[in-house]
A protein has these predicted regions:
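Short hydrophobic/aromatic patch on the recognition helix
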Residues: 52-62
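Amphipathic, non-transmembrane alpha-helical scaffold segments
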Residues: 21, 25, 73, 77, ...
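Alpha-helical DNA-contacting segments of helix-turn-helix folds
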Residues: 62, 69-76
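Solvent-exposed, amphipathic alpha-helical segments
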Residues: 31-38, 79-90, 108, 167-175
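Hydrophobic alpha-helical connector segments
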Residues: 71, 82-110, 124, 187
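Hydrophobic/aromatic-rich alpha-helical bundle segments in the mid-to-C-terminal region
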Residues: 116-121, 125, 129, 133, ...
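Basic, helix-initiating cap at the start of DNA-binding domains
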Residues: 1-38, 42-50, 67
């Protein structure tokens, strides 16, 4: 009986510490996204300041800048994957579904132009591809369905179509970030380019 009483407060305390740590990590990741959007070279000290914590707290959770960038990237990919999935890629006619999904994906991706540029420069192409898999895998059934219905090219493998869509989206992001193209005009161009490339005619 006494053992139960002594263990319960300890478990509650451990849960509180975990919850506090999770909140701290979330605030640091949010702060990193804000800071990096303004300055790709933002320091750990600046990120700590924005998160409202001391620098030691940032290093406690993320021992290196690379580990923080990895966590921020994982968070961003999760956000984009959620938006992509929420657009219901398995519903409707393939062409309409692709347009709907690309719009949803682009709307969320547009929050992360600078982060995408940072990761493109720091990671090998193969690693960048692997980390984007949670998003790109959602396009596979959609493209396969379009090929089966004859509205998407079937003479090229799905992997090629995925690489093409990813490359167009990344190029669009780079153009917006450079200021060469207005973001308001990119979305329709992105979708038209992807649909034209996939069309068998």
């Amino acid at each position: 009986m006494s053992n139960t009483k002594t263990k319960t407060p300890a478990k509650a305390s451990a849960r509180k510490r975990r919850a506090d740590a999770e909140r701290s990590i979330a605030s640091i990741i949010d702060a990193a996204l804000e800071a990096l959007a303004i300055d790709p070279d933002a320091s750990m000290a600046e990120i700590a300041r924005r998160a409202g914590v001391v620098r030691a707290t940032v290093y406690m959770h993320f021992p290196t800048r690379e580990s923080l960038l990895d966590a921020v990237m994982e968070h961003a990919v999760g956000q984009v994957a959620e938006a992509t999935s929420g657009a219901e890629p398995t519903q409707g006619e393939p062409e309409e579904a692709l347009e709907r999904v690309l719009r949803a994906t682009w709307h969320k991706l547009s929050d992360f132009h600078t982060l995408l540029a940072i990761n493109t420069s720091r990671l090998p192409a193969s690693e960048l591809h692997r980390r984007h898999e949670p998003v790109m895998s959602l396009f596979v059934p959609l493209i396969e369905r379009g090929q089966e219905k004859g509205v998407f090219r079937s003479d090229l493998p799905v992997a090629w179509h995925l690489a093409m869509v990813r490359a167009i989206a990344h190029a669009a992001s780079a153009e917006v970030r450079s200021g060469r193209i207005e973001e308001s005009s990119v979305e329709d161009a992105l979708i038209a380019t992807a649909l034209n490339a996939l069309s068998p005619s």
